[in-house]
Amino acid sequence: MKTELTLNVLQTMNAQEYEDIRAAGSDERRELTHAVMRELDAPDNWTMNGEYGSEFGGFFPVQVRFTPAHERFHLALCSPGDVSQVWVLVLVNAGGEPFAVVQVQRRFASEAVSHSLALAASLDTQGYSVNDIIHISMAEGGQV
């Protein structure tokens, strides 16, 4: 019997369990990615894109990218797996730099991710630079 990927299940899974689902095939990985995406709130006028193959490099079992309409930067939520034992939220400038981990989570905390996304969207709308958004997000988001 297949386990339903609820928020509670996502919060209790370890890195190996995320890797096991990725290894089970593309359908399973898609279901996992969609389960994570269902728990997140993308800011208005931002796109939310999940990785299903290796579009974003294929380093994580789950990677969801959030991008404002102007596409000058994006925030990427990356799950635990072989590369990292924790969840990380990374801000990447469109040119690749600056690049910063703005949030680290020992367990999936969708409300903290959604808060960080809303904060970045608000700062962006107010005209803050990408560097400022990184520093403020790091100070606000930090470790969860």
UniProtKB/Swiss-Prot annotation:
Read off the Gene3D superfamilies from this record. Answer: Plasmid SOS inhibition protein
Q: Does the keyword Ribonucleoprotein apply?
A: no
For this UniProt record, the keywords arranged alphabetically read as follows:
Plasmid
**InterPro entries named among the record's database cross-references:** Plasmid_inh_PsiB, PsiB-like_sf
Protein role? In contrast to PsiB protein of plasmid R6-5, this protein is unable to prevent SOS induction for potentially two reasons: less activity and/or insufficient expression.
Give the family per the record.
To PsiB protein of plasmid R6-5.
- The name under which this protein is listed is Protein PsiB
Upper lineage: Bacteria, Pseudomonadati, Pseudomonadota, Gammaproteobacteria, Enterobacterales
